[in-house]
From Swiss-Prot:
Biological process per Gene Ontology, one example term: lipid A biosynthetic process
Post-translational modification comment from the UniProt entry: 4'-phosphopantetheine is transferred from CoA to a specific serine of apo-ACP by AcpS. This modification is essential for activity because fatty acids are bound in thioester linkage to the sulfhydryl of the prosthetic group.
Parts of the chain that traverse the membrane: none
UniProt-recorded name of the protein: Acyl carrier protein
PROSITE patterns with a match to the protein in the record: CARRIER, PHOSPHOPANTETHEINE
Pfam families: PP-binding (PF00550)
Source organism of the structure: Leucothrix mucor
Entry keyword set: Cytoplasm, Fatty acid biosynthesis, Fatty acid metabolism, Lipid biosynthesis, Lipid metabolism, Phosphopantetheine, Phosphoprotein
Gene name of the encoded protein: acpP
Pathway the protein acts in: Lipid metabolism; fatty acid biosynthesis
Any single Gene Ontology cellular-component annotation: membrane
Residues modified to O-(pantetheine 4'-phosphoryl)serine: 37
Length: 77
């Protein structure tokens, strides 16, 4: 597991209060991890802070799974 992947998963665990075992790469924030719209906004803000990057709203809407978050961060580092 890459450093970025682990950091993304740590942010997800912290923000959504879920067990680390539930945070698989294919996990959907809403369908699998029980996030609501406010949770997803806060999750994006936490990812921005963790990685020092800005995620525009139109991009944030597309980040619906753990893997998509990892891919976004990797391509914008």
């Amino acid at each position: 597991m890459s450093d970025i992947e682990q950091r993304v998963k740590n942010v997800v665990v912290e923000q959504l209060g879920v067990d680390e075992a539930e945070v698989t790469n294919a996990a959907s924030f809403v369908d699998d991890l029980g996030a609501d719209s406010l949770d997803t906004v806060e999750l994006v803000m936490a990812l921005e802070e963790e990685f020092g990057t800005e995620i525009p709203d139109e991009e944030a809407e597309k980040i619906t799974t753990v893997q998509l978050a990892i891919d976004y961060v990797k391509s914008h580092q």
